[in-house]
Amino acid sequence: RQEQSQTEKALALINTFATGDTDTARSLLADGYIQHNLAYGTGADAFIGSVEYLASADVKTTVNNIRAFEDGDKVFLQTIYNFAGAGEQVAFDIFRFDENGKIAEHWDNLAALAEPNPSGHTQTDGTMEVTDLDKTEENRELVKNFLYDVMQGNNLDKTPDYFDGDNYIQHNTGIADGVSGLNAALGALAEQGISMVYDDVHMVLAQGNFVLAVSEGTFGSTPTSYYDLWRVENGKIAEHWDVMETIADQSTWQNQNGKF
């Protein structure tokens, strides 16, 4: 049988949370699996332990993958999980594959599933189709520049260059569509003395018209991990999905690999 693609392997791995299939999980993972979700131990054994724990729970875990992308040795996924009935969560997962095709490292960001936002969009609906595979690097570069100029505030006067007028489809749970919607939300936060700061960009992954950025900063005074997925259309930023997560206090970490 044909070797599974990296994306198929990543999807097979997350599905073991629902099936309890430890053999499949074991076959997909590198022994030295590096976990950056700070609530879990690191290594393949810790992952298998989670699968076994979920399999034994009274309420079955559900895994509903929405989008899947591949970039070099990494796969990035947008998925709705409900772990043992604890409540639906929207997640971005990133898996790195080693030279043997095993899953060797994992990063993620999770947030509770919310009601539709002021423009009626959910955290996961919207455009699905991956296109413009010939523009992957161009789109990655555009988002890197956007992060530097706009999200990090280095050249805010360039903001209009990145958008087609006010057209911007927004899936953030608290913000309305349009560049105007984003500005209004940031203005309202500023009035409360809250700023959204992007200090470091750790990863910018891309496939065609979709680009995922992993950034570290603060929301108010809280250390925060930002996962932002942008869809690029004709060289402009057209649509945005995100998950923001507070970075847990180091005293609670179950591994010492760090969030990033």
Segment roles from a protein language model:
Residues 1-260:
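C-terminal and inter-domain tail/linker signature
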